[in-house]
Amino acid sequence: FDNVTGAMYRGTYVDYNHGRALEFYNNGGQLVTGSYNSNGQTYHFATEQEAASSNGKLVVGQLIANGMIKFQGNTYDMIDNQVQTGQQKIDNNWYLFDKNSGAMQTGFQNLAPYGQNKICYYNPANGQMEYGQQNINGHWYLFDKVTGARLTGWQSLAPYGQNKECFYNQDGTMHYGWLDTDRYDYYFDNVTGAEYIGGSHNIDGRWYNFDNQGHCLDFNQRVINWFESRKDHLTYSMYGSRNGSDGTADCSGSMTQAIRDAGAGPYAYLYNTDSLHGYLRANGYYLVTANGNFTPERGDVIVWGRQGESGGAAGHTLVISQGGNDAQCISTCYYTNDQPGTAVQELPYNWYWHLDGCTYYYVYRQGDQHRN
């Protein structure tokens, strides 16, 4: 009877008071002893006489068996009539048996209760741990070739016989299509799951270029890269070319030129932070918020200073180079007090905004997230 509820026990039971003896109670709640037939198979449970003559090695009703057996719909591993539990290596294959009942476990299993921080997959057909690439219920997964641990994130399939880089989601499924991160956008082939690395690729009828790290060089990235490529090359000045053509630039002149070079329409002149708003709207940007709450996203163009009051040195503009809670921004700025070659700086956005006195701001974002 159950120690808590007092309910009569039926079915299999692992007696931990006597090692790990597997016992069976029939529908009437009676302990089975002697021979017992189940699903065409005959099993033997120790009788009182056998237990008495075993010198303490058997208890009444203990299943007498060795090796793998199937009983009452479960598979057990028996050694010297004792149920084995946890991870067991049998004939060079790993199996998992429930830590309490001893029943073989199949499918996805978290091994944390068994002392290992990994998720593995045990083939339902034979209970064996699987390795490498596995198609399960129509989804591709990757399991470490040595440990069997389910892998996530970026993975090179070269050790598994394929020349491609793939990405596996948090649930272990292979990722297809766009993968948008806080810093870069990536694309994975819709059929093979291979990451697009380098070259030009047609995606949904539009051509995109990718660098040799798999970063998509879309419109937003080209704006950011305009600034990245000019680090250590520009000196801040509001009175020279303003767009870097003479080695000097200011924030709004740089932003105008960066957006134009990324593929926007021609500008009438190099705008300041007051007049830049119209150029942004005319080139696919929409206003996310004026001084309201927002989560920075890669490619956001932010203008500091109230429109109509931010001309000259009163305003600033920058682009978000990394979104999310740890947002980073890049711009041509006066942060280094006009030191030569240091005008382009990448700084933590929230820190920089507070440094500037939490000024009024406008956030603009491309309406076409994957503008090519």
Regions found by a protein language model. Give the residues of each.
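Intrinsically disordered, low-complexity
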Residues: N92, S200-Y239, Q328, N337, ...
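Hydrophobic beta-strand residues in large extracellular and virion-surface proteins
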Residues: Y36, Y43-F45, V223, F227, ...
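Extracellular adhesion/carbohydrate-binding repeat motifs centered on closely spaced tryptophans
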Residues: F1-R222
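N-terminal capping segments
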Residues: L217-G265, Q307, G312-H316
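Residues that flank catalytic or metal-binding motifs in active/ligand-binding sites
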Residues: K118, K164, Y184, R206, ...
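...with weaker cross-activation on analogous glycine-rich loops/strands in unrelated enzymes
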Residues: A264-Q345, Y349
